[in-house]
Amino acid sequence: MFYTHVLMSKRGPLAKIWLAAHWEKKLTKAHVFECNLEITIEKILSSKVKIALRTSGHLLLGVVRIYNRKAKYLLADCNEALLKMKMTFRPGLVDLPKENFEAAYNAITLPEEFHDFDTQNVNAIDVSEHFTQNQSKPEEITLREDYSNDLLFQAGSFGEETEILRRHSFFDDNILLNSSGPLVEHSSGSIAGEKPLFYDSEDGFGDEGAAGEMIDNLLQDDQNILLEDSHLNREISLPPEPPDTIVVEPDNPEYIRLPENGKMDETLSNEEEGFTLDPIDVSDIAEKRKAKKRKLLIDPIKEISSKIMHKQLTSFMDTLMVLELAPPTQRLMMWKKKGGVDTLLSTAAQDLTHAELKMLFTKCFLSSGFKFGRKLMQKESVREEVGSKNIVETSVMEELNFQQDLNQSKTWKDVIDGSKCSSHEDINKNINSEQDIVEMVSSGTEESSSMNAILAQEIENCTVELESSGNEQNIETERWNRRILQTLNSLRESNKMGMQYFSLMKLCRNSDRKQAAAKFYSFLVLKKQQAIELSQSDPYADIIATVGPMFYKM
């Protein structure tokens, strides 16, 4: 049977149809009502995926079953609605008896009842009593007025008896020195008799009973009386607790304060008791915990700051380098090569062309009497140069031995003749080169004052420099020419003996890497000069040389 995901997936458009065709018990009422048969039939007829004939038959079976279910549900709903309509609308049948066809009047009518509320007599309200509820007694809202015999110091004062002596402005000089003033007429005895005016009952300041004497002393301009021993030796008692009863001082019988009414004292005592507050329990107040000092912890910077990032973006040190140009002339190039400390301390002042003379010169530095600061470095450089020269000489000797094995004694004569000729040519060239070097050194000492003058003269004397430059290059080229000629002569001798092919591997047998490289280079130079022809079968295979057109003409 042909199945597709359109039929088997739970959310597919034909999933319910497929379920109805194969598993009708799984269909619910919601599935039946949600299914739109018109759309599903169109999808079956014009589906995007080709459906097999048997599969389409199963789908049509599912459509028929869903349609049957819908028809059953519709029929059941219609029957239920018809039954309810028949039960509700019954012509001529009423559930109530005939007597109760109409409702009673009292059952459908609310009673009208007017309640009689008790009204109060307005005239019976005592307005005066209502307003006197918030009135207080005159004694409670009126200050007590105490009048004494002397009205001099009480005039204009309002309960400030204790502050009189503390104010300097009250005893101005114009009042004390005025002859017409009332203070002049008073005597010391009269002032002493007025102690109750200044005396505050045991205020604890130590001046009890001495207020009048203080004023008398001030009027008499005697300042030392206050420091008498009689006043200092008096015992002053601390103020006792205020008793409930009125205290009458025995020393001051004149100053007695009596309340006008007993009720006023009672109200005052009640007010004092009412306004005194109980002490607060300290244990109830929670002590504030002392906050611990927090240490200032600063995180290390783990990100690249904007300044560093901008600096990295704008720096071109990695991509840009200083332009190092070669010297413009060959003489300056030679000075740069030979101007180092190693070459100056290991070679002579003049350029010695012969290898034996250089060897003799370097042997002088190997003596025990040579003591400088950089002795070890110089010895190492000298040893390296000596070793390199010895390697060159040993390679030449090994080549000569190899040629001796292959060739006859005639090749030795050719080599000796060639070396003699080259030595004569070297001597002639060295004479000219020594003269050029002397001129170069003398001109270099004169031109060391300024670089611009050197460059100008170097451009003018370009032809002279070409003649005197490159003695070392000439030596190297002569060495390579000698080796190439030796290789060519050995190949000629082998060809005369009947060999038509020359193998590079056989020639390089029992040779080190440097000798093999020299022989390979000689083969390449001979190939360039068309003296031999080279061939190789495979990469990294043996190189075979054959006779070329210029083999005997060079």
From Swiss-Prot:
Q: Does the keyword Nucleus apply?
A: yes
For this record, the Gene Ontology CC terms, alphabetical, are:
chromosome; meiotic cohesin complex; nucleus
Gene Ontology BP term (one):
replication-born double-strand break repair via sister chromatid exchange
Q: Could you tell me where this protein is found in the cell?
A: Nucleus; Chromosome
Q: Does the keyword Nucleus apply?
A: yes
How does this chain assemble?
Component of some meiotic cohesin complex composed of the SMC1 (SMC1A or SMC1B) and SMC3 heterodimer attached via their hinge domain, RAD21L which link them, and STAG3.
Q: What does this protein do?
A: Meiosis-specific component of some cohesin complex required during the initial steps of prophase I in male meiosis. Probably required during early meiosis in males for separation of sister chromatids and homologous chromosomes. Replaces RAD21 in premeiotic S phase (during early stages of prophase I), while RAD21 reappears in later stages of prophase I. Involved in synaptonemal complex assembly, synapsis initiation and crossover recombination between homologous chromosomes during prophase I.
Q: Which gene encodes it?
A: RAD21L1
Q: Which residues cross the membrane?
A: none
Into which family does the record put it? Belongs to the rad21 family.
This chain's protein is named: Double-strand-break repair protein rad21-like protein 1
Per its UniProt entry, which superkingdom is the organism in? Eukaryota
**Gene Ontology molecular function terms on file:** chromatin binding
Q: Which UniProt keywords apply?
A: Chromosome, Chromosome partition, Meiosis, Nucleus
Task: Show the Pfam families listed in the entry.
Answer: Rad21_Rec8 (PF04824), Rad21_Rec8_N (PF04825)
InterPro entries from the entry? NXP1_M-like, Rad21/Rec8-like, Rad21/Rec8_C_eu, Rad21_Rec8_N, ScpA-like_C, WH_DNA-bd_sf
